[in-house]
Amino acid sequence: MHLNKMKKVSLKTYLVLFFLIFFIFCSFWFIKPKEKKLKLEKLRYEEVIKKINAKNNQNLKSVENFITENKNIYGTLSSLFLAKKYILDKNLDKALIQLNNSLKYTKEENLQNILKIRIAKIKIQQNKNQDAIKILEEIKDNSWKNIVENMKGDIFMKNKEIKKAILAWKKSKYLEKSNASKEIINMKINEIKR
């Protein structure tokens, strides 16, 4: 009887050890390839950024391919860099395409808001102020409201809607935490009142 109990206990111990070893083996089996994939994506991302920063514009097609293949943080960040390059080259339509494509697959709210603000800035440069306001109004997160209201004030000022501009800037100033930004907003308001 005592021998039977020992066999049951040792069998349980062996089973637990077997499953533990099996679990550890499987976790390494599945985790290692994911780590390698992330490292490869990071290396490819670094290469893409180098291509964007290079003076040669022929590299940009491969950058665009990287962005469409990588619908993740690396694709979004690459898209932001490429859009910046297009903006500096005065190619606003291509910049808009990059930002809009990234906006479609980006799930992180703060990145979405950054993309929307960049899109709105391009719309302002293209004198599509109503489109810019619509895009800015899509940003619902209160932590971005100071930036949204500041940009709305700039748009209203550009449209010669002075009262709306002052109101938007005052909202922005109220929501702003940075003293330097508050000072800039004050300068905008004081410039209008002269």
Swiss-Prot record:
One of its GO terms (cellular component) is plasma membrane. Keywords: Cell inner membrane, Cell membrane, Chaperone, Membrane, Transmembrane, Transmembrane helix. Pfam families: TPR_21 (PF09976). The chain crosses the membrane at residues 11-31. Its main location: membrane. Residues 32-194 are periplasmic. It is a single-pass type II membrane protein. The keyword Thylakoid does not apply. InterPro entries: SecYEG/CpoB_TPR (IPR018704), TPR-like_helical_dom_sf (IPR011990), YfgM (IPR026039). One of its GO terms (molecular function) is protein-containing complex binding. The keyword Transcription regulation does not apply. It is found in: Cell inner membrane. Residues 1-10 are cytoplasmic. PANTHER family: ANCILLARY SECYEG TRANSLOCON SUBUNIT, UPF0070 PROTEIN YFGM. Belongs to the YfgM family. Interacts with the SecYEG translocon. Forms a complex with PpiD. May mediate protein transfer from the SecYEG translocon to the periplasmic chaperone network via its periplasmic C-terminal region. This is Ancillary SecYEG translocon subunit.
